Amino acid sequence: MKLAQDMNVDEIFLKQAAEAIAVISSSPTHTDPIIRELLHRIRQSSPLSAVIPAPENVLKAGEPENMARGLIRIPETQTKRTGGNNHSKEGAQLYSCAKCQLKFSRSSDLRRHEKVHSLVLPHICSNCGKGFARKDALKRHSNTLTCQRNRKKLSEGSDVDVDELIKDAIKNGTGLL
């Protein structure tokens, strides 16, 4: 195993990402199948397999010894895009997005997702002018390095006052970026 001082930035990032995924995956609550798949792909494709820990302690949903812990297996029809039908194996209805064909097990998830396709971006960052369809995405973006870089690009790119541009964007409901 390599020591931290012998690894480059990419190796350190991959190691930290794999460790974070392993920690999340080892929680006794429901493990997201996407997280399991990402960890599997990292282990398969990375030349750093010696750096990335194997999850001997990762609990697998649906296995008999883990059923007592409350872990359940989600049918593949609910975790992947499905073919023609809108029902999972258990008969639960899946809700399809008309624009991109993603399927959701709850109608509320579909309604939330559909905002991504909206042309009007009602949530505008007051610092850099970037528009978002959802308020939670704006909150995640606020005060990030990306936000600071966006503002810097706006101020360097024109002689117009950045704050005036942002006010217009908020009033019109269209992001600057």
Swiss-Prot record:
Subunit structure, as described in the record = Interacts with MET4 and MET28.
Look up keyword Metal-binding and say if it applies: yes
> What is the protein's name according to its record?
Transcriptional regulator MET31
Bilayer-spanning residue ranges? none
Annotated signal peptide:
none
**What biological-process terms (Gene Ontology) are attached?**
negative regulation of transcription by RNA polymerase II; positive regulation of transcription by RNA polymerase II; regulation of sulfur amino acid metabolic process; regulation of sulfur metabolic process; regulation of transcription by RNA polymerase II
Concerning InterPro entries, the annotation shows: Znf_C2H2_sf, Znf_C2H2_type
